[in-house]
């Protein structure tokens, strides 16, 4: 369905994720790599996740040196594939995959499953896909945007990061609408 969208999603993701950060207030960033190195993020990949992916320590100098080509397979395997991006409606794939990167694949999937009224187990399977096909793509993208915004507003650190999360959600929503096959 949406296999053609992987590269476009990755490009949009790189726009949102940007370069190197070391914000210890960020709960998604503050965990170290498990080897005594403080948490940092490059192109949206945390030191913890990069160390897990490579099986090697991820000190700041390693993180700063990461390139888009380095992280692309990581994002495809750990985010796009678990949310079954290739099986989702075009446009909806962007919305769910971006939430998966921002809040975890399971959360991204559960948000979608709640919208569909199916068991929210965090794994997009055949039941979820069947329910998706019983719904209008644009309606699902709109509902996902609203649900994602609601999720962010409930977070304790919304006062710190909310403006950026809301901007990202809106940009993803607008892009998602342009990709829907009507």
Question: What spans do the regions from the language model cover?
Answer:
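Cell-wall polysaccharide-cleaving catalytic domain and substrate-binding groove, primarily
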Residues: 1-182
């Amino acid at each position: 369905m949406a296999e053609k969208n992987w590269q476009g999603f990755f490009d949009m993701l790189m726009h949102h994720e940007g370069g190197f950060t070391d914000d210890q207030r960020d709960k998604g960033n503050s965990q170290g790599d498990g080897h005594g190195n403080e948490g940092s993020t490059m192109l949206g990949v945390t030191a913890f996740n990069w160390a897990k992916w490579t099986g090697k320590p991820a000190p700041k100098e390693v993180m700063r040196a990461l390139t888009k080509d380095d992280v692309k397979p990581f994002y495809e395997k750990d985010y796009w594939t678990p949310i079954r991006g290739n099986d989702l409606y075009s446009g909806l794939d962007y919305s769910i995959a971006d939430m998966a990167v921002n809040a975890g694949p399971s959360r991204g999937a559960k948000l979608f499953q709640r919208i569909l009224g199916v068991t929210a187990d965090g794994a997009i399977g055949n039941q979820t896909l069947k329910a998706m096909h019983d719904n209008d793509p644009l309606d699902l993208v709109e509902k996902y945007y609203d649900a994602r915004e609601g999720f962010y507003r409930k977070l304790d650190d919304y006062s710190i990061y909310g403006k950026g999360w809301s901007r990202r959600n809106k940009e993803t929503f607008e892009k998602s609408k342009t990709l829907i096959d009507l």
